[in-house]
Amino acid sequence: MGALIGEMIALSLMALALGMDAFSVALGMGLLRLRLRQIFYIGLTIGLFHIFMPLVGMAVGRFLSREFGSIATYAGGVLLLWLGGQMIVTSFQQEEGTSFLPHGAGLLFFAFSVSLDSFSVGLSLGIFGARTMATILLFGLFSTVLTWIGLLVGRHFRQWLGSYSEALGGSILLVFGLKLLFS
């Protein structure tokens, strides 16, 4: 029983760490003009990706973990750099609106980039034989809720920042992209 509790605590802490990463990125995304319905779907989509990606990672397991661990981190960094750059460029254009819209393919692209780190964690957990169902449910729950919180906090600050909010949001994504590339 003690081992089960210890594993659940460890998995919860990992889920919190991955969820905090999603929260940080969601702060930047929340600076866009988002409706509550969009916030709901963005959080839900990121949560689903945080279920799917570690599940795939756990299935791939030990053999590929060394090769894909660093590749996934670099790919996530490049994706966040691209998305952040797009947001910054768009903020300086005179058009009302944005080239990145958090729905459809853009939302899937964003959710994929945010959840790449959970793929790497899933690879590691697959090696150690962690409980699959507990892992993916905790990862999905934490990332969904923390994404919602990040989007709502970002949305609140958008009112204070006005037209500079999208550039700031893009800058936040750029910083996290650089962090992934150089850590």
Curated annotation (Swiss-Prot):
Record keywords: Cell membrane, Ion transport, Manganese, Membrane, Transmembrane, Transmembrane helix, Transport
Subcellular location field: Cell membrane
InterPro entries named among the record's database cross-references: Mntp/YtaF, Put_MntP
Transmembrane segments: 8-28, 39-59, 68-88, 108-128, 133-153, 162-182
Domain of life: Bacteria
Short name of any one Pfam family annotated for the protein: Mntp
Annotated membrane topology: Multi-pass membrane protein
GO molecular function: manganese ion transmembrane transporter activity
Family: Belongs to the MntP (TC 9.B.29) family.
HAMAP family tied to this protein: MntP_pump
Protein name: Putative manganese efflux pump MntP
Species of the source: Geobacillus thermodenitrificans (strain NG80-2)
Organismal lineage: Bacteria, Bacillati, Bacillota, Bacilli, Bacillales
Gene: mntP
